Amino acid sequence: MEAGCPHHAFGTGILGRSIVPDQNRIMKGTLVVDGTSTEATTGAVADVVVTSVPFWLDLDGLDEESARFLAETLQLHRLAVEDAEHFGQRPKIDEFDDFTYFVVHGAIPESFATSELHIFLLPHGVITVHHGDCPALADVHARIARRHLIEDVSPQVSLLYLIVDSLIDTFFPVLSRFDDRIDELEDDILRQPTEAQLGVLFDLKRSLIAMRKVITPQRDMFAALASGVVELPSMTAEGQRYFRDIYDHLIRIADIVDGYRDLLSGVMDTHVSTVSNRLNVVMKQLTIIATIFLPLSYLTGFFGQNFTFLIGHVTGRLPFLAFGLGLELATVLVLVYFFRRRGWIGGPTT
């Protein structure tokens, strides 16, 4: 036995190489073996690797020591481990000699953003890496605890399907919220368009574009997986049927996203048209007012009309100046109040 590691023996591990476990250190995650979840430690992981027992190691982020454990003890390729350390990766499948590395994206139910999951598919197990809580994985943990696995495929392929399927399904409730939000905005715009609505529309459009960027490569990725272009260890024809189901879901999601993007463009056009029509109405009313006062101003200016009441009642330069400026200021304030009440400046119409 290795000095300093009394709990572990050398052996041929999950990658077909000699496993030399390091110190029994607690990892930030959960180890699932035979439906039972326990706190993940390097010693426990090394044990299941040596015995080739099907397992699932679910990690909440990779610190430097955990990354070193995956690379040196489990002997995963350093390029894949480095990718798993840094989030912001595009969806992809990388095939290595002893394992397959996935980057899969889902949706965050509380917002219109996307989440990212890194998956290592090994001959006898699965390792997942994510940041923070992942509700999709919580559902998978619950299913495994109830022993709801797919019986006609290998345990690791079954687990991979459950994880990816649960992650992809998170898009549907988020897209349903998109639909409701777009309908609300369209009703609000037809009732009263505002600048704030335009900002919300652009935010939604950016979210859809971000979602489209992860959906399209994932659709192509699982198309290759379902058709057998990419071959996974222990993958059977029955397993490919399950991944074709994921591919079908991704096609539906991509079509929905494209439809919502077109719908948002139509709502933006509606906003612009509504604002333009409203501006035309305002200009029409102002033109009528100006047309009424134009001949009156011409006549009073042509004949030099003045108010005789001012003669003898307002004397001196300062009182006359104060009266004139005060009357002008009062006129401006009345007009501003009238325009605001009509919603022509500074707010909605009444």
Model segments located where?
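Hydrophobic alpha-helical transmembrane segments and their immediately adjacent juxtamembrane loops
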Residues: Q75, D248-T350
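A generic secondary-structure micro-motif detector
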Residues: W56-L57, T236, L286, L325
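Peripheral, non-transmembrane regulatory/ligand-interaction domains of membrane transport proteins
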Residues: G4-M235, R241, D245, H249-G259, ...
